[in-house]
A protein has these predicted regions:
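Radical SAM [4Fe-4S] cluster-binding motif and immediate context
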Residues: 1-127, 135
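Short, well-ordered amphipathic alpha-helices
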Residues: 17, 47-49, 146-158
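Flexible glycine/acidic-rich beta-alpha junction loops that bind and position SAM and/or redox cofactors
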Residues: 42, 99, 103-104, 133-141, ...
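Catalytic cores of alpha/beta
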Residues: 76-77, 136-153
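Short acidic/histidine-rich active-site segments
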Residues: 130
Length: 179
């Protein structure tokens, strides 16, 4: 197994773990802090189905969903996540500037973020988008593009949380990104 596979564990245990937490500690909501949770969408489908099959009265959300991954989610998967009581996820939209997205090698486009956002309209799943500003060479016009993207995402889906724009220095991105 790869290190990521070892870390992600056997999916059959996660719904069981939720059930244990519900029974033992009366947990009503679980927050999963895993940037790689959504990498394997088949695994995510199995987890959501396992939670649904157990009919647990537990909602859950995930810190960590790459914008590429949310763009690949099918409507069927999104509906399954919603039925399994997934209430949200955090994803980095980063910038409204195509040039900046290319510069930081994010492997997403602005349109990809816009299209993925629309998929969650009408569900109980609340995407939280994070943004970063003040990249080296970023112009005021590019910063305005990011602000405009925030407003566009909110216009298209009133059920989102547009995170604040975090300055590049605080984001902890290394200079190696730009070499």
């Amino acid at each position: 197994k790869t290190p990521a596979e070892k870390r992600s564990g056997d999916i059959k245990y996660l719904p069981k773990d939720f059930e244990y937490l519900k029974e033992r500690f009366k947990v009503g909501h679980i927050y999963i802090n895993d940037d790689n949770f959504f990498v394997n969408l088949l695994r995510v489908k199995d987890i959501a189905q396992g939670l649904l099959d157990r009919n647990l009265d537990i909602s859950w959300e995930v810190l960590g969903a790459h914008a590429q991954t949310t763009a690949r989610m099918t409507n069927d998967l999104i509906q399954l996540l919603d039925k399994s009581r997934c209430t949200g996820f955090l994803t980095g939209a980063e910038s409204g500037s195509p040039r900046i997205l290319e510069l930081i090698k994010k492997n997403i486009t602005v349109q990809m973020v816009i299209d993925a956002n629309k998929k969650f309209v009408g569900t109980g799943i609340v995407p939280t988008y994070t943004f970063i500003s003040s990249y080296p060479t970023e112009t005021n016009d590019e910063l305005k593009m990011t602000v405009n993207l925030m407003f566009r995402l909110l216009k298209d889906n009133k059920n989102i949380i547009p995170g604040n724009i975090k300055p590049f220095i605080e984001a902890g991105i290394g200079a190696s990104v730009f070499s």
